[in-house]
Swiss-Prot record:
There is a cross-link at K453 (Glycyl lysine isopeptide (Lys-Gly) (interchain with G-Cter in SUMO2)). One of its GO terms (molecular function) is protein dimerization activity. It comes from Mus musculus (Mouse). This is Sterol regulatory element-binding protein 2. Residues 94-104 have a biased composition (Low complexity). Pfam families: HLH. Belongs to the SREBP family. Keywords: Activator, Cholesterol metabolism, Cytoplasmic vesicle, DNA-binding, Endoplasmic reticulum, Golgi apparatus, Isopeptide bond, Lipid metabolism, Membrane, Nucleus, Phosphoprotein, Steroid metabolism, Sterol metabolism, Transcription, Transcription regulation, Transmembrane, Transmembrane helix, Ubl conjugation. Activation by cleavage is down-regulated upon activation of SIRT3-dependent PRKAA1/AMPK-alpha signaling cascade which leads to inhibition of ATP-consuming lipogenesis to restore cellular energy balance. Residues 1-50 are annotated as: Transcriptional activation (acidic).
């Protein structure tokens, strides 16, 4: 035995050990069971090789001379036998009688690649036999090779000597064959694929050797046994079938029939050949041959062999290679390839997982695909039914049709549940779940009979009427009341009676005129009867239209489940931004409720006309009271009437919310543009049904529906139906209550006069794709009220800043006193804006059950930040240092949405606020830090002027830019005046440095550039140009001319439009007076007392404006001039 052979054997056994440890037989059985169950559903994906059955059979043959022993035909295989060698130990046997000893025999075995060997189980079967004699013959067995790997010779001598002992080898599929006493040397040729490479030669004096294999042949030896050399060459077979036959001495061919689970039948012709290998032969000439079997060192009870027999050395550990090992290796290799392919399909090529995990994932994935397929089939079925009923059967309630058809489909579907459902991958899976869902997900409520109640069929009143039938009934009623055929019938009846009895009256007749004695009673009774009949007819029509004609859907019924499925799907589509899919689901909801949208102009005209009539009738309290009484009497018991009334109100509420959401999508432009009549129709439907729902709908939702209707009429109909928009707006305000207690915070701005004025002036627009704004957070794109609220917040911010940078108009043309100062107006606007901004996040979706639809997730932090920044600037201008410090903590926290935009205007405002805060610091470096922040803000402001044309809200951008530029120039002026005042105390003259002048000139250049596109900036240019000349110490003549431009008063009559924007305001005039009185020489003033008069006027103006810092400086200058108290009092 060479070393390479031993190393190869060891490597092969290690590979098989690793494969056995990684994949268990339980996983393989589970996968095979699952694949076999899927053959019916996926015939193209699975083959039926492992599922096919093989017929079984066996044949027994033998001689008639010797019938002392027969083998048992094992047609069926015991499952306990089909196990590995490690699980089935070999039973021991005990000798029953002593036998003569024989010399040891050696057997040469030619092994093949290793495979798992069949199960060996020796059983003691004592059978007395006559004494045997030994002869020597030679038998050569030469089977055909199909695949022949490299052959290795392994010496494995095993000798068993027993007088009366039968040795039995058990394997599946037993078959017996009885030989004749006379056996001649033959040659066995057989077409197989694999033959085990080990044989056992057993020498017995008088005994029987039985061999049971998958294709097992039982051989009964004759009394005379002779030793014949047998040469067996192994072959490669696909299964563990083995063939054993005996040799007859007469030379006749013997046919051995073999049955195997993988092969139908094998037939081996037996021929004689030259004797080459010695075997055991009985005394009467019978040749005994055995099947090749594997008996490992740890499987054979060698210790029970009689002591007289010489035992050879045990085989080495690396020599356990059998044909079954080869079969098992190929079997596992095939399984491994398929499992790797499954892993690549399910989890990808890069995933790493054990084979059992791959099988579980594959089973779960197939279950998931089945679940999705089932859901898609059900949704497709419902959508097809709804589409078909919309086109063909508009006058029939779709709910009942969906109910019956869905029941039929579900019954058909439930019959195939077990066929379509694969076996559970986890033994702990609960059976209560739907067979189409994975283990952790409950089944669909549409197929779960426990969740959907079997409600009785709705009564005829729940079917409803189409709008064409309603209009037709109204027209017939109107025509009947107009022509009044009952009056003609009564008159015809009275005339007929008069003709029959012309002179039978009780009164007198003068010139053929009869004077009846009945009086007023004769004509009053027919009139009362006529009005009574007409009233009954009209009331019946109202009951038919408003009570019996309304479709009602029972809760927990099949149509109700379908409605809620599509309603929730519409919520998810709206949250994801898929507005087309949401609109389709909402239309399906309306179809299920029996309120399909009109598809033709005739249907649209009838629906619109009926909704106008219905809205008019609902405003009549008498009609509502009569309908309520009739409705209560129509039901048998009060409890039944109350229950049906609740169901009717719930159905009306659901339909109203669906109409309202569709109307919002049409207004915001998320759907293809339709006609104005279609929008008015949806608005009226939502309003009518919401009012019918009464207490079932929230007051805030009812207010929102009326406001949306007003917006739709305002945007789509324009000035034609503007009065209707005002009516619905007033109606919404009346629903809020006298003290606006029921109005939600998100709609409170419409109750304010400024909000109403803004809404009615239509200075807003609803866009389908709202642009991102720097001044407000993004609102819900499908909510028109949120978009109008966003526009109103920006309008308030613009008004607040405009009151600071633009002059205020006078109350009257002849009134010399101007309005209140810009600071108070700006603060009032900012206060309103702050209150309206905080209430943005409390608005809910009309579908209150959905938590994913919100107009905003909280207050508008962006608009709040701008409010805090402008308020801080006003506080700094007023000289309120405490308010500046408190507001700076809010301004310092810039929202992330503004940081992401990287807007230079936002950075300019932020650094300006930091500069104002640093200027209040009492430290030595406070002014230097303020100057550095001013430089950074100046650079960002210049950048914003270059990109301002490409941003949204251009008017608001110009106002903010002008305000920021004015703040920077005012801050630079304040810093210069502080340094100049400190120098004057020391008796020195202070002139600004070149860096300060360069920064001031850069901001002044930004102001001039802004004035070219925004005219109100001119009112600031002259004042700041005069300031920079004073800082540089330039000639005072030109400086005085520039200041005169701000000091001069101008008449308001005969002024062109736009010139008022360039005039300086009150604060600019007071600031110019302070600069002139402080820095200009006295010779530039007209009279010696003019300076004190101008300072007194400036002090009154600054006090009125609220600029406490500048007013204090003015008072100090008046005191220095002397006599300032008397001048101020005058």
């Amino acid at each position: 035995m060479d070393e390479s052979s031993e190393l190869g054997v060891l490597e092969t056994m290690e590979t098989l050990t690793e494969l056995g440890d990684e994949l268990t037989l339980g996983d393989i059985d589970e996968m095979l069971q699952f694949v076999s169950n899927q053959v019916g559903e996926f015939p193209d994906l699975f083959s039926e090789q492992l599922c096919s059955s093989f017929p079984g059979g066996g044949s027994n043959g033998g001689s008639g001379n010797n019938s002392s022993g027969r083998g048992n035909n094992g047609g069926a295989t015991d499952p306990a036998v089909q196990r590995s060698f490690s699980q089935v130990p070999l039973s021991t046997f005990s000798p029953s009688a002593a036998s003569p000893q024989a010399p040891a025999l050696q057997v040469k075995v030619s092994p093949t690649p290793p495979r798992a060997t069949p199960v060996l189980q020796p059983r003691p079967q004592p059978q007395p036999q006559p004494p045997a004699q030994l002869q020597q013959q030679t038998v050569m067995i030469t089977p055909t090779f199909s695949t022949a790997p490299q052959t290795r010779i392994i010496q494995q001598p095993l000798i068993y000597q027993n007088a009366a002992t039968s040795f039995q080898v058990l394997q599946p599929q037993v078959q017996s064959l009885v030989t004749s006493p006379q056996v001649q040397p033959v040659t066995i040729q057989q077409q197989v694929q694999t033959v085990q490479a080990q044989r056992v030669l057993t020498q017995t004096a008088n005994g029987t050797l039985q061999t049971l294999a998958p294709a097992t042949v039982q051989t009964v030896a004759a009394p005379q046994v002779q030793q014949v050399p047998v040469l067996v060459q192994p072959q490669i077979i696909k299964t563990d079938s083995l063939v054993l036959t005996t040799l007859k001495t007469d030379g006749s061919p013997v046919m051995a029939a073999v049955q195997n689970p993988a092969l139908t039948a094998l037939t081996a012709p037996i021929q004689t050949a030259a004797l080459q290998v010695p075997t055991l032969v009985g005394s009467n000439g019978t040749i005994l041959t055995t099947m090749p079997v594997m008996m490992g060192q740890e499987k054979v009870p060698i210790k029970q062999v009689p002591g007289g027999v010489k035992q050879l050395d045990p085989p080495k550990e690396g020599e356990r290679r059998t044909t079954h090992n080869i079969i098992e290796k190929r079997y596992r290799s095939s399984i491994n390839d398929k499992i790797i392919e499954l892993k690549d399909l399910v989890m990808g090529t890069d995933a790493k997982m054990h084979k059992s995990g791959v099988l579980r994932k594959a089973i779960d994935y197939i279950k998931y695909l089945q679940q999705v397929n089932h859901k898609l089939r059900q949704e497709n079925m419902v959508l097809k039914l709804a589409n078909q009923k919309n086109k063909l059967l508009k006058g029939i309630d779709l709910g009942s049709l969906v109910d019956s058809d869905v029941d039929l489909k579900i019954d058909d579907f439930n019959q195939n549940v077990l066929l379509m459902s694969p076996p559970a991958s986890d033994s702990g899976s609960q059976a209560g779940f739907s067979p189409y869902s994975i283990d952790s997900e409950p089944g669909s409520p549409l197929l779960d009979d426990a969740k959907v109640k079997d409600e009785p069929d709705s009564p005829p009143v729940a079917l409803g009427m189409v709008d064409r039938s309603r209009i037709l009934l109204c027209v017939l009623t109107f025509l009947g009341l107009s022509f009044n055929p009952l009056t003609s019938l009564l008159q015809w009846g009275g005339a007929h009676n008069t003709d029959q009895h012309p002179y039978s009256g009780s009164g007198r007749s003068v010139l053929s005129l009869e004077s009846g004695a009945g009086g007023w009673f004769d004509w009053m009774v027919p009139t009362l009867l006529l009005w009574l009949v007409n009233g009954v007819i009209v009331l019946s029509v109202f009951v038919k239209l408003l009570v019996h004609g309304e479709p009602v859907i029972r809760p927990h019924s099949r149509p109700s489940v379908t409605f809620w499925r599509h309603r929730k799907q519409a919520d998810l589509d709206l949250a994801k931004g898929d507005f087309a899919a949401a609109a389709a689901n909402l239309q399906t909801c309306l179809s299920v409720l029996g309120r399909a949208l009109p598809t033709s102009r005739l249907d649209l005209a009838c629906s619109l006309s009926w909704n106008v009539i219905r809205y008019s009738l609902q405003k009549l309290r008498l009609v509502r009271w009569l309908l309520k009484k009739v409705f209560q009497r129509w039901r048998a018991t009060p409890a039944t009437a109350a229950g049906f009334e609740d169901e009717a109100k719930s159905s009306a509420r659901d339909a109203a919310l669906a109409y309202h959401r569709l109307h919002q999508l049409h207004i915001t432009g998320k759907l293809p543009a339709g006609s104005a009549c279609s929008d008015v129709h949806m608005a009226l439907c939502a309003v009518n049904l919401a009012e019918c729902a009464e207490e079932k709908i929230l007051p805030s939702t009812l207010i929102e529906i009326h406001l949306t209707a007003a917006m739709g009429l305002k945007t789509r109909c324009g000035g034609k139906l503007g009065f209707l928009a005002s009516y619905f707006l007033n109606r919404a305000q009346s629903l809020c209550g006298p003290e606006h207690s029921t109005v939600p915070d998100s709609l409170r701005w419409l109750c304010h006069p400024l909000g109403q004025k803004f809404f009615m002036e239509r200075s807003w627009s609803i866009k389908s794709a709202a642009k991102e704004s720097l001044y407000c957070a993004q609102r819900s794109p499908a909510d028109p009220i949120a978009q109008v609220h966003q526009a109103f917040c920006k309008n308030l911010l613009e008004r607040a800043v405009e009151s600071l940078v633009k002059p205020q108009a006078k109350k009257k043309a002849g009134d010399q006193e101007e309005e209140s100062c810009e600071f108070s107006s700006a603060l009032e606007y900012l206060k309103l804006l702050h209150s309206f901004v905080d209430s943005v996040g409390f608005v809910t979706s009309p579908f209150s059950s959905s938590s994913v639809l919100r107009s905003a997730l909280g207050p508008d932090v962006i608009c709040r930040w701008w409010t805090s920044a402008v308020t801080m600037a006003i506080s700094w201008l007023q000289g309120d240092d405490a308010a500046v410090r408190s507001r700076f903590t809010e301004v310092e926290r810039v929202p992330k949405a503004l940081e992401v935009t990287e807007s230079p205007l936002v950075k300019a405002v932020f650094y300006t606020c930091r500069a104002m805060h640093a200027s209040l610091s009492g430290k030595a470096d406070g002014q230097q830090n303020s100057f550095c922040h001013c430089e950074r803000a100046s650079g960002h402001l210049w950048s914003s002027l270059n990109v301002s044309g490409t941003t949204s809200d251009p008017s608001l951008n110009h106002v903010i830019q002008l305000f920021t530029c004015d703040l920077l120039l005012s801050l630079r002026t304040a810093l210069w005046q502080k340094q100049a005042s400190a120098s004057q105390l020391l008796g020195e003259t202070y002139h600004a440095s070149g860096t300060e002048l360069a920064g001031f000139q850069r901001d002044l250049g930004s102001l001039r550039r802004l004035a070219h596109s925004f005219r109100p900036a001119y009112r600031k240019v002259f004042l700041h140009e005069a300031t920079v000349r004073l800082m540089a110490g330039a000639s005072p003549t030109r400086t005085h001319q520039l200041l005169e431009h701000s000091l001069r008063r101008r008449p308001t009559q005969n002024t062109k439009h736009g010139e008022v924007d360039t005039w300086p305001g009150q604060r600019e005039r007071a600031t110019a007076i302070l600069l002139a009185c402080r820095h200009l020489p006295l010779s530039f003033l007209s009279s010696p007392g003019q300076r004190a008069v101008l300072l007194a006027e400036a002090a009154r103006t600054l006090e009125k404006v609220g600029d406490r810092r500048s007013c204090s400086d003015c008072q100090q200058m008046i005191v220095k001039l002397g006599g300032g108290t008397a001048i101020a009092a005058s």
